[in-house]
Amino acid sequence: MADLGAESVVSVEYRGRVAVITIDNDKKLNALGQLQYYALARAMQEVAKHDEVFVTVILAKGRYFSAGADVSISRAAPVDATDSHKLWLSTFVAFNLNITHTFATHPKVLVVGLNGPVIGLSAALVSFADFIYAVPHAFLLTPFSSIGLVAEGGASRALVQRLGPAKANEALIMSKRLWAKELLDAGYLNEIFDYPKGEDAAFRERVLKEVDERLGDHLNGESLVGIKKLIRRPELETIHNANVHEVFAGLDRFVKGIPQEEFRKLASGEKRHKL
């Protein structure tokens, strides 16, 4: 199992034709800072280079799949507008472009197992998966409008495409929480595996069993990734455009100081998202 550095809560394990990426930061509900999202991107980029791998599975340990961005990390910006623009351009824009591009262009069949809620940027990125499985108590929440941001992580295209415009508008514009059953009915999830809270280890094993049974040696690996490439090809240019537009719209918000003030309120407990 590869460890991707001290800043990382991400690990990679190779199981023949399957690579398993695991997020393990339960004490923070698997919230991720910029360096940890970078580590996740690097893990996926590493897997992409392995010719023997045809399926990438992303799993998480603990109560949440991911609570999104780690709001406990300071997001204070310089007072000077030029310095502020430079800071967010070199951090927010660069890191978001990288992680979104990595998910959008990942060449392996991508499987995600939601052991619990998925929030924010993480929820947007999950939408790029080819197969998504979840527990009944999982929910998706993209509270961008609540924290003064706009859509990110390719959500304005990938999440809308997978969830459908009606539910996607509820998720993105209203910052509405969508439970697993709603996600399944909308076609966002492939299947719900009935495991209660506290059974995340058993759920992870169930997802891996599904992968072995449905995407195993009885299917030609080159065909799997070849079919995915053909399915995704018409959308890629649109996704790349959405990614660029999202990060620069987000940059404008950060330069104005709007989201970091909302993050401060959340971190201090002054504000709670209306779940």
Predicted feature residues:
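Glycine-rich beta-to-alpha active-site loop
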Residues: F95-I147
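C-terminal long alpha-helix characteristic of the crotonase
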Residues: Y133-A138, L189-V244, G257, S268-K274
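Glycine- (often His-adjacent) and acidic-residue-rich active-site loop
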Residues: E52, A60-I99, V118
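Conserved CoA-thioester-binding segment of acyl-CoA-metabolizing enzymes
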Residues: M1-K61, L275
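Well-ordered beta-strand positions
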Residues: F131, E170, M174-K176, E182, ...
